[in-house]
């Protein structure tokens, strides 16, 4: 079963859920606003795909926190991400050991077939 992490009212999440449903694929959705990742879960995500992939530098949270010109260590960025999980690029899809970040229907097709 695929796990989808994101925010319920996010357009990318809505599109992802619709794509999965139209493709007949079962999934479990985790709303990061209602069920934030634990430190350990976020560490696992970062370990598997890296902060650069996980952080949404185009989003509202990134802009509101004015992080663009700050020189932050990975530890500082991790803590900011843990405290501001709306800054996680969406969606995050997990299937077994595979993880996929961002909305990309072509990538979804390969991801669900593996």
Regions found by a protein language model. Give the residues of each.
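Thiol/selenol-based redox catalytic cores and closely related redox-interacting motifs
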Residues: 34-114
